[in-house]
Amino acid sequence: CFIPVIYFFVPESVHWLTRKQPTGALGKINKTFRRLGHSAVAALPDVSPEVRKKSVGDIFSPRLMTTTLIVSSAYFLHIMTFYFILKWVPKIVADMGFAASSAGGVLVWANVGGALGGAVFGFLTLKVDLKKLTIVTLVFSAVFVTVFGRTPANLNIMSLFCAMAGFFSNAGIVGLYAIIAQAFPTHARAFGTGFVIGFGRGGSVLSPILAGFLLEMGMLLPSVAVVMAVGSVLGAIVLMFLKLQSDSPSEGSRIENKRKASVMKSSVAEGHSSAV
């Protein structure tokens, strides 16, 4: 039901309008500028045919293939750890002899921790480098998933460490979403995000199956937790090799330079008028 609202009321990004320059692009850009309190521009920067022809499939081009593989792998691996907590906590707690309602209560604390983790992570990104913060968060996610697997059969202790595991694992998801948004250039960002998340969701399917298989083989919970926590560790290692992309100066900075030049010309013209 929100699709019509988005279609009619959410404007296209300035980057996209500058790159593609469809009919009425200048008017739409100036309308956005006015809403943000900026001066209008008189003309759009020149865009080469090669730039206009760039497609969403560029995420598989030689320039972006490494980025696509790294981000997709990191997300897939961390999702494996994240969904172990999300799907297996109630079963694990119930198998310890607690009532189903108590098992559900422990999972609630995982979600509470996750909500807090996402909020705190968002605040910290204002002060700490995004990639470094995400890597550290993934490592702590693995630590607390491992600790949860070794907690005694005590609801309070399990709830505490489950909340901490939820805190860091969900914060890691938030960090990966932010990295995905920065990893791809504007024209391929939507498709790149969809591809990475779609690929990574395979981890949400595989994670419960793998954990169940390990438990069925007779592996004890502490060992299973260690194995499932490895996903976050590997995700953190993979992220170390990522070089975040930035948009070409031909998009954002060129139109900003156009705007500044337009403002300067207006100021000069006003100065001449005053002198006369």
Language model regions located:
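Helix-to-loop junctions at the C-terminal end of transmembrane segments
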Residues: 118-129
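Intracellular juxtamembrane helix-capping segments at the cytosolic ends
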Residues: 171-184
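Interfacial helix-cap and linker-helix signal at transmembrane-aqueous boundaries
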Residues: 93-94, 124-125, 211-219
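Extracytoplasmic gate region of multi-pass secondary transporters
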Residues: 60-118
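Loop-to-transmembrane helix entry/capping segments in MFS-fold secondary transporters
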Residues: 100-101, 186-196
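Central mid-sequence intracellular linker of multi-pass
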Residues: 1-49, 237-263
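Structural signature of the two symmetry-related core transmembrane helices
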Residues: 132-146
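A membrane-interface helix-boundary motif in multi-pass transporters
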Residues: 215-230
